[in-house]
């Protein structure tokens, strides 16, 4: 009972997703209407989505369907990005979507990387570096494209880029690694305490350990992302206000409260949460178009 008071695990996957969706929506309102405080709130969304992606790939019963959903959504967003640049009406709105990237591609590549790492064959595990390399290439291409000092980057088109370069992919991988580190911790502890490491498997104590390590990994990767941007800024212009991304660390507070339970998971909510992304963007963009045309 004392442990419950100290570490109340209150949030299921359902509630983490709700929080992620709400903060993402606030963020996109901030993008369309240039409201800075909304962008601050929006920094909490990415780590939560990445955390859920890592949990999803580890517990999914059908990996092919899981990546198919992410792949379809990534393709839809890619088409939207192309349309925003090629269709005159949307191009004239100057929404700046070409710089946004495809968030579902971040999640897809992160999930594929984790799937490779979960494989028992070492040469399959090594393939996990390919999604991360893709994210790094996307990050570099976006940096040069936003800088504009080298002209348009044609070797890596904007409609196949990740939204956060390597950062989102690394987060998904990192949250999976948190589970491995937790198991290692209990294994090392068993050597000194004499308690079998399997005793903690599937327990509340194990979940707390995973949550704490996940929050620490989030902090380290966020600081690394900040450092990389800070170094880049010394040499090229960086359009993104990367300092704001440091607020992502706050989402670790929600991760610390994760119970490990799935929670509400009806089919309509599963597919609705995917469809919500393009629909809410379309609604916010339409409202912005009306407001700015008045």
Model features per residue range: what roles?
Residues 1-294:
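Alpha-helical transmembrane segments and their immediate juxtamembrane cytosolic regions
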């Amino acid at each position: 009972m004392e442990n419950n008071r100290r570490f109340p695990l209150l949030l299921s996957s359902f509630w983490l997703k709700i929080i992620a969706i709400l903060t993402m929506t606030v963020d996109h309102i901030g993008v369309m209407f240039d409201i800075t405080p909304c962008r601050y709130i929006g920094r909490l969304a990415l780590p939560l989505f990445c955390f859920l992606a890592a949990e999803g790939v580890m517990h999914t019963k059908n990996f092919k369907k899981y990546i198919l959903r992410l792949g379809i959504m990534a393709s839809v967003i890619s088409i939207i990005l192309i349309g925003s640049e090629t269709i005159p009406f949307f191009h004239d709105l100057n929404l700046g979507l070409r710089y946004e990237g495809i968030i579902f591609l971040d999640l897809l590549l992160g999930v594929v990387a984790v799937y490779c790492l979960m494989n028992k064959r070492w040469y399959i595990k090594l393939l996990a570096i390919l999604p991360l390399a893709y994210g790094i290439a996307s990050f570099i291409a976006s940096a040069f494209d936003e800088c504009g000092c080298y002209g348009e980057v044609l070797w890596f088109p904007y409609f196949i880029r990740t939204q956060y370069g390597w950062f989102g992919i690394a987060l998904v991988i990192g949250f999976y690694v948190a589970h491995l580190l937790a198991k290692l911790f209990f294994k090392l502890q068993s050597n000194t305490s004499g308690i079998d490491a399997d005793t903690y498997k599937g327990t509340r104590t194990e979940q707390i350990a995973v949550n704490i390590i996940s929050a620490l990994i989030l902090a380290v990767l966020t600081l690394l992302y900040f450092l990389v941007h800070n170094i880049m800024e010394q040499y090229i212009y960086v359009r993104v206000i990367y300092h704001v991304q440091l607020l992502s660390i706050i989402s670790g507070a929600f991760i610390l409260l994760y119970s490990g339970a799935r929670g509400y998971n009806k089919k309509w909510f599963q597919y609705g949460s995917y469809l919500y992304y393009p629909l809410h963007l379309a609604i916010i963009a339409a409202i912005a178009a009306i407001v700015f045309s008045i």
